[in-house]
A protein has these predicted regions:
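Class I (Rossmann-like) S-adenosyl-L-methionine-dependent methyltransferase catalytic domain
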Residues: 1-55, 61-63, 67-117, 131, ...
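Short catalytic micro-motifs in class I SAM-dependent methyltransferases
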Residues: 126-127
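A short glycine-rich, Lys/Arg-flanked "PGG" loop and its adjoining helix->strand segment in the class I
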Residues: 137-149
Length: 230
């Protein structure tokens, strides 16, 4: 079942490419009204501030780069970015949006991707929660191999909060790692979605040879900054 759901995730983000940013910018089905939207953006500002505490680096690897929401932030930190995603549609949006010679785009399924070099900083946002538990260790080991000795990692993901998703989605606080997601046109896809607690994420990062500080915002986000332990 895991392989089928992973393929569904890829198809989901392919079909969602042109509406993905509605979630981030709280428009359309994700508009929760002035108060909740402002809460979302205030908490995003906290995460962005933490990201920009990182000193400038030469080369960044961004995994699951998506439509460029965070790639544009990373351009302020890195001299060069390698941006990887499994979905050509989001890579195209990212590329057209940024039009930066500093970004090298590559299309890879992150479950078959293998690092061929090391980077100063590895970044991924809203991706780890889509990694099935059976694939988590191998993925994080590959991340570790892609970070140079003493290099850095920054991760952003979702907390369990019902108002984070579309108004016609219902987040269930149960033990299932699977969720059904719906697009604007009514198409439905099954995906993996796991909400980590800070201690859980910290333990996984320690196992992958990172010493990290994991933090949460009040409602919406969990994020981690760490360095590779040699």
């Amino acid at each position: 079942m895991t392989n089928d759901v992973i393929q569904q995730q890829i198809e989901y983000y392919r079909a969602r490419a042109n509406e993905y940013e509605q979630w981030f910018y709280r428009t359309g089905r994700y508009d929760r009204g002035k108060e909740l939207n402002q809460r979302w953006f205030d908490e995003l500002a906290i995460v962005k501030t933490a990201l920009h505490q990182i000193e400038p680096v030469k080369h960044i690897l961004e995994l699951a780069c998506g439509t460029g929401i965070w790639t544009q932030e990373l351009l302020q930190i890195g001299q060069q970015i390698t941006a990887i995603d499994a979905v050509s549609e989001v890579i195209e949006i990212n590329q057209q949006k940024l039009q930066s010679p500093k970004v090298n785009y590559q299309q890879w399924d992150l479950f078959t991707w293998e690092p061929y070099q090391q980077y100063d900083l590895v970044f991924f946002s809203f991706w780890l929660s889509h990694v099935p538990p059976i694939r988590l260790n191998s993925f994080l080991q590959k991340v570790s191999h892609s970070v140079r000795a003493g290099g850095e990692i920054f991760i952003i993901d979702s907390r369990f909060e019902p108002t984070s998703t579309a108004k016609d989605h219902i987040l269930k606080n149960d033990e299932s790692i699977y969720q059904v997601r719906k697009l604007n046109d009514g198409q439905k896809f099954q995906i993996v979605k796991i909400f980590y607690e800070p201690d859980e994420l910290d333990n996984e990062l320690v196992s992958a040879h990172f010493k990290a500080e994991v933090k949460i915002t009040e409602n919406y986000f969990i994020y981690a900054y760490g360095k590779k332990i040699t």
